[in-house]
């Protein structure tokens, strides 16, 4: 099966089952949340399926980039079909289909992924860190809202336009988080994990209709050896409101909410080269848990 813009229902079910098997076997998901949405037909992507007879044994997904951002790919091989050259064929298909500079994610960047990248003469070009922190100890700092700022939680679709404005201004540089449309908000508010009480928003007292920043939390269902986990899902600050401590206070508001829901651990993702954010999160007690690495062909 060659590249396709959408998966037939039967293939999508097989790919989803393959992702589940690989997640259970490896202890980590081989594709992102965005990738899962695309498999289910809720996001634009190109799909490539490797078959053994009628059985899906390999899968690659290619997300188109832009003039500023490269194409991004994810791939997975059935745990029972590895070391047969399937991964090499999937990677070749990705680099043949993608634009120059296409990148492939290695979620967890385990030794096998590092060796696989070396065998294809790929180089690491982007590092995404997952940080974690227990919510019970050390004690969370108190929430101190800056003077002249009001915080509240999500009220519904009436808030969406401001969330989109701030998100896209704050993440204009980001290949996945930037460029959101209403569809991205609708997908997430329709998810079973969404709780409007866990989406925190900050406004100036003098301008209560203009959003300064937001923190969208998420709760992950138990998976593998992991219990239910909280996540600092998105923290977005309007560039015009930077430097007022809003990122810290919004992050803490979400962490207090997750703790009060009875969760024991919170996670977040941050770019490996974002030293300012890393410093902020480390001061809040976060430690590095694992690394996702993106690889590309050497120039």
From Swiss-Prot:
Catalytic reaction(s) noted: 1D-myo-inositol 2-(L-cysteinylamino)-2-deoxy-alpha-D-glucopyranoside + acetyl-CoA = mycothiol + CoA + H(+)
EC annotation from Swiss-Prot or TrEMBL: 2.3.1.189
GO biological process: mycothiol biosynthetic process
Domain N-acetyltransferase: 1-156, 149-299
The entry's keywords: Acyltransferase, Repeat, Transferase
InterPro entries linked: Acyl_CoA_acyltransferase (IPR016181), GNAT_dom (IPR000182), MshD_Acetyltransferase (IPR050276), Mycothiol_AcTrfase (IPR017813)
Residues that coordinate or bind acetyl-CoA 1: 75-77, 83-88
Keyword Transferase found: yes
Pfam families referenced in this protein's UniProt entry, alphabetically: Acetyltransf_1
Residues noted as binding 1D-myo-inositol 2-(L-cysteinylamino)-2-deoxy-alpha-D-glucopyranoside in the record, renumbered to the chain: 33, 176, 218, 231, 269
Chain residues that bind acetyl-CoA 2: 235-237, 242-248, 274-279
Subunit-structure text: Monomer.
NCBIfam families in the record: mycothiol_MshD
Homology family: Belongs to the acetyltransferase family. MshD subfamily.
Free-text function comment from the UniProt entry: Catalyzes the transfer of acetyl from acetyl-CoA to desacetylmycothiol (Cys-GlcN-Ins) to form mycothiol.
Record's protein name: Mycothiol acetyltransferase
Gene: mshD
């Amino acid at each position: 099966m060659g590249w396709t813009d959408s998966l037939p229902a039967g293939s999508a079910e097989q790919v989803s089952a393959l992702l589940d098997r690989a997640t259970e076997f490896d202890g980590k998901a081989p594709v992102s949340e965005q990738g899962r949405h695309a498999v289910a037909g809720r996001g634009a992507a190109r799909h490539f399926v490797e078959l053994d007879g009628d059985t899906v044994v390999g899968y690659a997904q290619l997300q188109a980039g832009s003039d500023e951002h490269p194409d991004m790919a994810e791939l997975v091989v059935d745990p029972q079909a590895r070391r047969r050259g399937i991964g090499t064929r999937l990677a070749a298909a990705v680099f043949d289909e993608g634009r120059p500079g296409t990148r492939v994610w290695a979620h967890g960047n385990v030794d096998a992924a590092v060796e696989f990248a070396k065998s294809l003469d790929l180089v690491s070009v982007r590092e995404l860190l997952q940080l974690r922190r227990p919510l019970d100890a050390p004690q969370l700092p108190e929430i101190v809202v800056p003077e002249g700022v009001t915080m509240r939680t999500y009220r519904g679709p009436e808030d969406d336009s401001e969330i989109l404005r701030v998100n896209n201004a704050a993440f204009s540089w980001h290949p996945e988080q930037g460029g959101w449309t209403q569809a991205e908000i609708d997908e997430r508010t329709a998810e079973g994990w969404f709780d409007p009480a866990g989406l925190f928003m900050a406004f100036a007292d003098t301008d209560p209709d203009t959003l300064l920043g937001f923190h969208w939390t998420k709760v992950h269902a138990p998976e593998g050896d992991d219990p239910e986990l909280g996540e600092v899902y998105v923290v977005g600050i309007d560039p015009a409101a930077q430097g007022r401590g809003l990122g810290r206070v919004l992050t803490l508001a979400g962490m207090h909410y997750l703790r009060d829901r009875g969760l024991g651990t919170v996670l977040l993702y941050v770019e490996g080269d974002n030293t300012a954010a890393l410093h902020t999160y480390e001061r809040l007690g976060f430690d590095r848990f694992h690394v996702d690495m993106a690889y590309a062909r050497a120039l």
